Structure formats: structure tokens, C-alpha cells
């Protein structure tokens, strides 16, 4: 649900007659990976494309899919970094609105997200001992230390 989403949401978006190519954002994001500017906040007013942007970034970075053909018609495919980062990362996508109902209320959302993410990470990395910690930050740190993998949230 959270870890390594597929590209179906973005595929649906680009199939729309009104899609406007925003993949230049991926080129920018690629340029700040492994720099001190790597922390990016996708903040926009309501109904201005936050979910579409998140879907695009997930489709591009997630190991949970193969998105090369999906991105070929768009600006990012001409970037020198296009294939370097394409589908190379574990990605955690969090849709807070969807989690409110699943968590049975707004007051349980943070605990719900943390517990579900921890469970998915422990299942995905079951061949590593990730039992030393029960916090999401701790598990993310352990995954990185034991595998070298970077995780996009």
C-alpha cells in the first residue's frame, strides 16, 4: 500500500486529454539527489496537482514498476539522467486522506501510517534483521545501513 507503488495512477493521468507535461520537475529532482538540497516539499494550493505530481514521481523512481516506455514521450526522456534514476529507488507514497478512513479517525493516522510502513519494510527486507527498532525512522535507518538503499518518501 505504501512501499514501491506501481505506475497505474500516472498512466491514467497521461491518458487524459488534458495532461500537460510536468516531467521537468523530475529533471530538477534528479539534479539535487545526493546534495544538501535533496529535501523537497510538494506544496501547492488545493486542487493544483499535488497528487498528480506525487504519482509522477512515484512512477519514475519506484522499484515497483517499469516506467521507461511510459515516460518516453515526455521531456524527461531527453535528459542525460533519465535512465540513471528511473525505477531505482524504494519509494514510500503516503496519501493521508486515504489513511484517515483506514485508521478509523484522524487521531490514529500517524500511528497507522508508521505501523503499516514498518510492516511493509520488514516484509520487503525480511532477509535482514530489522527487529532492533520499532520506529519508522529507526527501520528506515536500518534498511539504509544494511543495504545502502536510499528511500524516497
Model-derived segments and spans:
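Phosphate-binding site recognition
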Residues: 1-153
